[in-house]
């Protein structure tokens, strides 16, 4: 295991108003610094085997049928760091049950974003996938099994600016902006992730891209991406707030 280092994070939150609102998006950044010693937290709702304190603060499965008759499901699991140290989110798994308790689907190796979250911060396990041979009423319950550990990798975030979110006929939404490397190390395979929230601060979708080129020290590069298979009724007007993360690919062993 790598030694626990002081972790640095820069979280950029862009509040995006719905169409027709004349207010300009606001930008808020926050600096998180890890504590050298981990103190015991009081009564966490979930605790991983290594003592990582977290809770599943929201989960939902939304089912829809696309234009060619294929059933899709969007699964969202929100994970909140309730402890006092940074947490690493590895790929997780979940089951989907119908209203009778019957198993409809079981999924593994489900992506999580971002890979490291600070105390009080939220991440998500997220997937959009097809449901084979499904003909139910769409009322599904998520049985989530996130993989959460205390982080032994640094929490690194890159600055994001010039962001706009707009409708896209094919991808549902289009996210455009720039990412800047203000650290002293170049990075490859940099993730840029958008998590979309409604007016009640509930996550309603996500999209991401991976920068194809190295992000050199001091460089600022543009990005543009859309959703993979967001629900058919998803538009930019559904989004009250978008939180963006840019960070290097990190694996914890």
Locations of the language-model features?
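Positively charged n-region of N-terminal signal peptides that target proteins for export
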Residues: 1-5
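Bacterial signal peptide processing site
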Residues: 20-22
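Short acidic/proline- and small/hydrophobic-mixed sequence motifs that coincide with surface turns
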Residues: 84-89, 103-104, 184-189, 203-204
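Intrinsically disordered, low-complexity Pro/Gly/Ser/Thr-rich segments with frequent PxxP/GP/PP motifs
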Residues: 104-133, 205-232
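Terminal connector regions
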Residues: 131-170, 229-253
């Amino acid at each position: 295991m790598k030694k626990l280092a002081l972790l640095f994070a820069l979280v950029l939150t862009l509040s995006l108003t719905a169409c027709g609102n004349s207010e300009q998006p606001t930008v808020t950044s926050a600096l998180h610094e890890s504590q050298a010693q981990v103190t015991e937290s009081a009564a966490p709702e979930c605790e991983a085997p290594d003592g990582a304190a977290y809770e599943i603060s929201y989960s939902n499965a939304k089912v829809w049928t696309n234009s060619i008759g294929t059933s899709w499901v969007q699964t969202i699991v929100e994970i909140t760091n309730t402890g006092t140290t940074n947490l690493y989110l590895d790929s997780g798994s979940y089951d989907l049950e119908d209203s009778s308790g019957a198993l409809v689907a079981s999924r593994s190796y489900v992506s999580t974003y971002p890979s490291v979250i600070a105390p009080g911060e939220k991440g998500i396990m997220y997937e959009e996938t097809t449901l084979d041979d499904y003909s139910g009423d769409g009322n599904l319950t998520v049985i989530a099994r996130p993989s959460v550990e205390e982080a032994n990798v640094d929490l690194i975030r890159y600055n994001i600016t010039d962001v706009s979110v707009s409708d896209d006929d094919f991808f549902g939404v289009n996210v455009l902006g720039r990412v800047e490397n203000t650290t002293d190390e170049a990075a490859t395979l940099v993730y840029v992730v958008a998590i979309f929230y409604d007016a009640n601060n509930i996550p309603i979708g996500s999209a991401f891209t991976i920068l194809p080129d190295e992000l050199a020290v001091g460089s600022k590069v543009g990005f543009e991406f859309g959703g993979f298979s967001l629900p058919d009724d998803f538009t930019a007007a559904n989004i009250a707030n978008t939180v963006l993360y840019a960070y290097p690919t990190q694996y914890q062993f």
